[in-house]
Amino acid sequence: MSALPAMPRQSLQRFPSLVHQRSVPAQPQELPQKTHYRIHLIRDRSVRDHNQQKNIKELSKEETAIYRNSLKKNICIEMLRKGYHKSFSEVFTVIQRWNALRDAAGPGSAIWHQKPLEEQQEILDQLQHFLTRAEAAQRAGYYEDVYKNQLALAQYFQELDDRWLSYHFFECCFQTATKIKSDGGRKEAEAHENLGLAEEEHGQLEKSAEHYEAFYHLTVGRIWKDETGRSHNSLACENLWRIYTLQSDKMLENRECQQAIKTLIKAFDMAREGDNKKLEGEAAYRLGLAHISSGNPQMAITYLNTYMEISKMLEDNVSLGKAYKAMAKALESQGKILESVEYLENFIKIAKLNNLSRSLIETYSCLGDIFNTRGNYEKACQYFSEAYETALSLSDLALIEETQVQYSISKAHKMMLTVSRLTDTADYASIGHLLAWKMNRSDIFSDPAKPELTSMKDTEDGGKSNVIMESSDDPENETSAELVATS
């Protein structure tokens, strides 16, 4: 590898201008100016550093700890510094119990995916605010204020749909309400109602009923009213009606009819005492159905008559239709078919006037069932056909399929009358008719005006007459009679 030739060093003598500049002495008048300029720069920097030091704020140990500690720790320390030891214990206990509840639920549960309570600043702020105020009021002996602050927390968590925390503070409200003697027990009554609602949401019907009954007894003879102007006693009656109704539903599911009837009677009495006609009618309707299930149609008719009267008074056509249907069922169980059909046909008129299409379908189907069970397949086909046509107008596929099956079964039953008659006759003509039908699989028995095939039909005077029928190859004429055909 060859090296590059060395660069010749050039002397400064070849650049006289540079040499001349280096040999020129500095001007005397410029020295003070440069020195003064340098001093000026140093002086400015010292002033700037001094101002920066003045603007820097030193943090105290407490302020530094705020940034270092967790949110929960800061709130707890603040409450302890201000002397709210009970509030500190309450917050700490609530967080511990919430975490234990979360761990018990395990991964995959709804609470497991929630943000930990100690990391939710808004909730901790609300706890600190209302608990400290409640503690201060308790020290002063103002239990009404303690109750208000605890109730505010319970309602706050209720809005967040946190049932556990809302129930916890509703319990605290109840404990505080028992210490308030100046209001005649009003706060205690309200606390019972709140606990009853909370227990009902948890599905604890027995405990809920106990609180509602206590609420009712505390409000008897009182003129207390809530924010909407409703009396507490009417609210207690409504709550008891609802909880008794829920209890009776479970009893009926377990086929405890007599116990359910006793519970429904209590619901009926509560609705009547609360002067709520709609609830009274609903309780009477349920009592009627329960008596039908227990095999006592006469008592059912008594309550159903009450339901009909209330429905007419309230001009509630939907409820009136329910009453007619239930009454028809009770009369049918007594063997009074004509009266049963009359009630159902009355409801059909009401349903048509009020465009109650779904109720109309149910009634048509009910009438179809009655006639189908009694062997009047002609009438059954007529009503099931009406149900099917009405279902088509609603474009409800599930309902269409259900009514279609009912209509098909009734037509098959109707057709089987002729099939059975021809089979029993067993003569040459009858066998020929049956064979022709098996070859064509058309609805040859439904229309007596068709030629080619004849069958024997009963006349009104008990004799026999030949009915001519025709088979058809058109697939559109095929009906559900194929459901009962055998190959």
From Swiss-Prot:
Protein keywords: Cell projection, Cilium, Cytoplasm, Cytoskeleton, Flagellum, Repeat, TPR repeat
Record-level GO cellular component terms: cytoplasm; cytoskeleton; sperm flagellum
Record-linked SMART domains: TPR
A matching Pfam family: TPR_8
Subcellular location: Cytoplasm, Cytoskeleton, Flagellum axoneme
TPR-type repeats, residues: 92-131, 136-173, 189-222, 241-274, 281-314, 321-354, 361-394
GO biological process, one term: cilium movement
Entry superkingdom: Eukaryota
Region annotation (Disordered) ranges: 447-487
Entry remark concerning the domains of this protein: The TPR repeats are required for axonemal localization and flagellar beating.
Main function: Axonemal protein which is implicated in axonemal and/or peri-axonemal structure assembly and regulates flagellum assembly and beating and therefore sperm motility.
The name this protein goes by in its record: Tetratricopeptide repeat protein 29
